[in-house]
Design a protein with these regions (language model features):
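A short acidic, often aromatic-flanked loop/helix-cap motif at beta-alpha or helix-coil junctions
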Residues: 60-66, 85-87, 136
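Structured adenosyl-cofactor binding patch, chiefly the S-adenosyl-L-methionine
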Residues: 115-157
Length: 157
């Protein structure tokens, strides 16, 4: 996931612990994982000829991640959600994007976001979007939405 995110233009990756995440990391294991993920990000940046090496942040809770994007004044935050219907939401989001904007994308865990996490996202102003009729795996959803963002922000449409 880290490798593909970096290759597709992500400026950074913050691992988020959610209720349905299959892997639960204690603090010591999380630090080791983040170091490994950072090495993957560096390798992917080099391979894809990026001039900037995206940083992998420390693992945080979903609530902490929502607070972080609020504090950092992201221009837009969205959450692909399998119960969101139709493609109008993602079309509207893509239509409003402009180069240079800070965009946060929350990709769900293997078990998906639970209802309370989605309610929290809505309260925090995170826009739920559909990625189509199919339910995508975590490792597919991230690259799918990043490819759409890259195409839009790099002027392909």
């Amino acid at each position: 996931i880290i490798q593909k995110a970096v290759e597709l233009g992500a400026a950074g990756v913050i691992p988020v612990a959610t209720r349905n995440a299959v892997v639960k990391l204690d603090e010591k294991k999380a630090e080791a994982k983040v170091r490994r993920w950072q090495a993957i990000a560096e390798s992917a940046a080099k391979q894809s000829k990026r001039s900037y090496i995206p940083q992998v942040g420390m693992v945080m809770s979903l609530k902490e991640a929502f607070s972080y994007i609020e504090e950092q004044k992201f221009d837009l935050s969205m959450i692909p959600y399998e119960l969101e219907k139709g493609m109008d939401g993602i079309k509207q989001v893509l239509g409003r994007l402009a180069p240079g904007q800070q965009i946060a994308v929350f990709i769900g865990p293997e078990g998906g976001f639970d209802e309370e996490e989605i309610k929290l996202a809505l309260r925090m102003g995170v826009k739920p979007v559909s990625l189509g009729k199919r339910i995508l795996r975590t490792e597919t959803a991230g690259p799918a939405i990043l490819a759409l963002l890259m195409m839009k922000l790099e002027g392909a449409f």
